A protein has these predicted regions:
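N-terminal beta-alpha lobe that positions the nucleotide/phosphoryl donor
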Residues: 1-164
Length: 164
């Protein structure tokens, strides 16, 4: 594990507080970001430093602003970003942007997110790795004859899941 000294937590509320607690236990400095609507939120007071993001944006858009979060990370000298969960935590473009900015992303690699980010791709990765999987089909189109044939081949009962 890399030795980060200052971690920007790119999330809000209880999620940010939980990440902050863990980082504090490791002796790391924490940086909070907060949207205007969260300026009185506990996470913006519990961190070592706190910076407002997303001027003129709503709260969700503020926390989804890759540019805004990276701007704060660079300005305050954070050497790592922890995304928490939700928001940018599953966005491979955010991971790429952190890497390009020279800031470590605490989480999976962008390639891993891309491979496992949808059910069909994740299934192929599992099969290639030798992980047992239940019978299924590849993503089907709109040809009802093909769909019926694939359903019969897999067997009943069936469970249908959207793949995108």
């Amino acid at each position: 594990m890399a030795d980060f000294q200052k971690i920007l937590i790119a999330n809000r509320g209880e999620i940010a507080i939980r990440v902050m607690r863990a980082a504090n236990e490791l002796g790391k400095r924490n940086v909070a970001v907060y949207a205007e609507e969260d300026k009185l939120g506990l996470h913006s007071f519990k961190e070592d430093e706190a910076y407002k993001i997303g001027e003129g944006l709503g709260p969700v858009a503020a926390y989804l602003s890759i540019e805004g979060i990276l701007r704060v990370a660079k300005a305050c000298g954070a050497d790592a970003i922890h995304p928490g969960y939700g928001l940018l935590s599953e966005n491979p473009d955010f991971v790429d942007a952190c890497t390009e900015a020279g800031i470590a992303f605490i989480g999976p690699k962008a390639q891993t997110m891309r491979q496992l980010g949808d059910k069909a791709s994740a299934r192929r990765v599992a099969i290639e790795a030798g992980v047992p999987v239940i019978p299924a089909t590849e993503v089907l189109g709109e040809d009802m004859a093909q769909i019926k044939a694939q359903a019969a081949a897999v067997g009943y009962p069936l469970m249908l899941k959207a793949s995108w």
